Regions:
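Bacterial N-terminal signal peptides that target proteins for export
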Residues: 1-9
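Bacterial N-terminal signal peptides
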Residues: 8-16
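Sec/Tat signal peptide C-region and signal peptidase I cleavage site
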Residues: 16-22
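Extracytoplasmic copper-binding redox domains, predominantly the cupredoxin/blue-copper superfamily
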Residues: 22-187
Length: 187
């Protein structure tokens, strides 16, 4: 092998290693947690807000049963709350202790929900690189084809504003206002 060929091969290997090193894997746990004094437990992603870079992967880990990680996408017959050009994605129901991974390549703001637990508030926001896209708008449709029930309140919580996620790098479920986690009582 010539010196030029060896040098080219070494540079290619270094470039591949640099790209691989720049990509990060983040962990989001999927929980059901009993709450003292309440009949219904809390269903949530932790963290509930996350800043990542394009090319990063998120491992969604089921710590309790019957969770999915599903994009709010028009092709799922839901409000479209992911950047333009993002295909619809959803995990299957992830068994307890198992992981489902998704690599985010398109910059912008992604709203994600758990299929079985959306009505309990199990939604989250991921900012990939820079905020942008339809998820930057407040949730206004709280119907089953919008952002259903408590999940809309969760995504409208001020702690999940993209600017907050960018400033903090991540937002814990416990940083949300407790009023964002329950349906308001109707008179």
């Amino acid at each position: 092998m010539s010196t030029t060929a060896r040098l080219s091969l070494m540079l290619a290997i270094v470039a591949v290693m640099a790209v691989a090193a720049a990509q990060t894997t983040h962990v989001v746990d999927m929980h059901i947690t009993p709450v003292e004094g309440q009949p219904t437990p809390e269903f949530y992603f932790e963290p509930v807000g996350l800043l990542i870079e394009p090319g990063d992967t998120v491992d969604f880990v089921a710590l309790s049963p019957h969770h999915t990680a599903t994009a709010y996408h028009a092709q799922h017959v839901k409000s479209h709350r992911v950047p333009d050009g993002v295909e619809p994605f959803s995990s299957p129901i992830v068994p307890v202790g198992e992981v489902w991974s998704y690599t985010f390549t398109i910059p912008g703001t992604y709203d994600i929900w758990c299929g079985p637990h959306e009505h309990y508030g199990m939604a989250m926001r991921i900012v990939v690189g820079e905020p942008g896209g339809p998820a930057e708008e407040p949730v206004t449709d709280f119907s089953p084809v919008g952002v259903y029930a408590i999940s809309g309140l969760v995504l409208n919580d001020p702690a999940l504003a993209s600017s907050e996620i960018v400033a903090r790098g991540g937002v814990s479920w416990y940083d949300l206002d407790p009023a964002s986690k329950v349906m308001p009582e109707t008179p």
